[in-house]
């Protein structure tokens, strides 16, 4: 089992919202090696270019894997669709209605660069970082 922050009781795990993150929390905790560190819901401030302001952001999961690097994961639950031509992402609700959402890969990518900047400011350079998205409620892919 991986080291995970925060460590939650079964009751607390069952209260994680959205439920898609609950599934991923359980899977990462149980299936990753015990020398790996998983941080769930890592909050950070992102410096924006407009007026040098800051905005709060969150990475759903950040995995620190010794000898491999750092992986930042964005989780999207329920139905998810991406229009290949416009590259617009949608969530699909129970009534099959589409709702525009942010690009989950873009969200993970932004978080990755913020984490990289944070590490570099502390002298931690040359660390391999990657990003990705998980869709735990998707059972098939229609191309």
Task: Describe each region flagged by the PLM.
Residues 1-143:
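Intrinsically disordered, low-complexity Ser/Thr/Pro/Gly-rich regulatory segments
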